[in-house]
Swiss-Prot record:
Family assignment from sequence similarity: Belongs to the pseudomonas-type ThrB family.
Keywords (A to Z) from UniProt: Amino-acid biosynthesis, ATP-binding, Kinase, Nucleotide-binding, Threonine biosynthesis, Transferase
Catalytic activity: L-homoserine + ATP = O-phospho-L-homoserine + ADP + H(+)
Record pathway: Amino-acid biosynthesis; L-threonine biosynthesis; L-threonine from L-aspartate: step 4/5
Protein name: Homoserine kinase
Stored NCBIfam families: PRK05231.1, thrB_alt
Organism of origin: Caulobacter vibrioides (strain NA1000 / CB15N) (Caulobacter crescentus)
Broad enzyme group: transferase
Gene: thrB
Length: 317
């Protein structure tokens, strides 16, 4: 989450006239993430999150995301239910940009996940995959494997500026991923951005909720697991924590056992997931607006993860 669009008190009051939430009592920006402008909103009727959609989020995709949040909440999954306007719409407009209000979810994210957190996060991810079954909305993964080479072609110079010689290494990775990418895996609704800052825990360390579904799409469940392994199971020194990874997979399989083909595919999926986040961080590196309350994330963190995955992971003995 982040803040790119500033909202005045007068603009907020006019916007809230479209909702049955009472008068605003408190309002502040949330300076995390890189995608949208997010605000913590407190009104006479409770606490909420107001999001103004920016950058990569396409307006035509927003009904998919918001309807999915409602679908998940209706099925008992702890996701932020969208709040409808007085006319029943979940999508509105603020400062000429799409905007929505969702429920505030209790819980806290963790900066240094333990193996126990990883186990809980894994189970929460499997719960999400099961709760999403049957969701009628459809959205292709526009940051999936087919998008990586075109995206890199736009940012080759940035890669060389970061690390001379890196573009040739990435070219080789992309060629190998294209040849080795698994097909025909079980698919459905995935989160695609299930990072520690998008998962909340209760005070006792139990899974509480998942947030920030704005990369959600239809893709392989095991790819979502691979994204999560990369996000949760690397140490600050760049080493892969196999204990945390096995805990995460154990938690996932408490609710949804992985099939043999999914287990076999995980190492190459993890390499591809590292490529995806390297490339989007590379794209963000030179394009974050000046003055935004957020710093772009380091692409080289995911280049180092790519280097680990080139050696191959042994996740299942």
């Amino acid at each position: 989450m982040a803040v790119y669009t500033d909202i005045t008190d007068q603009e907020l009051e006019a916007f809230l006239e479209g909702y049955d939430l009472g008068a605003p009592l408190a309002f502040k920006g949330i300076a995390e993430g890189v995608e949208n402008s997010n605000f913590l909103l407190e009104t006479e009727k409770g606490r909420y999150i107001l999001t103004v959609y920016e950058r990569r989020v396409k307006a035509e995709d927003l009904p998919y995301f918001l309807n999915m949040l409602t679908w998940l909440a209706d099925r008992g999954y702890p996701s932020a239910r969208p709040i409808p306007t007085r006319s029943g719409a979940t999508l509105s407009s603020l400062r000429g940009k799409p905007a929505a209000i969702v429920e505030f979810l209790p819980g806290l994210s963790v900066r240094k996940p333990t193996a126990a957190h990883c186990r809980e996060a894994g189970e929460g991810l499997a719960w999400l995959h099961l709760a999403g079954e049957g969701y009628p909305g459809r959205r292709a993964n526009d940051l999936g494997q087919a998008a990586w080479s075109p995206l890199f072609s736009k940012h080759r110079k940035a890669a060389e500026d970061l690390k001379p010689g890196l573009s040739a290494t990435i070219d080789n990775d992309l060629a190998q991923l294209s040849l080795m990418w698994p097909r025909n895996l079980p698919t459905g609704t995935i989160h695609a951005d299930y990072f520690p800052d998008n998962v909340f825990f209760q005070s006792n360390g139990k899974f509480a909720a998942a947030i920030d579904f704005y990369f959600a799409c239809d893709d392989a469940y095991a790819y979502d697991v691979a994204v999560t392994l990369n996000a949760w199971c690397f140490e600050a020194d760049g080493s892969f924590n196999i204990t945390a990874a096995k805990a995460l997979l154990n938690g996932y399989e408490r609710r949804r056992p992985l099939s043999p083909i999914e287990k076999e595919a995980l190492p190459i999926l993890a390499r591809g997931a590292a490529m995806r986040f390297f490339l989007t961080r590379l794209a963000d590196w030179g394009s974050t607006p000046a003055g935004a309350l957020v710093r772009p994330k380091d692409p080289l963190e995911y280049e180092r993860k790519l280097a680990v995955h080139r050696e191959g992971l042994v996740l299942f003995a």
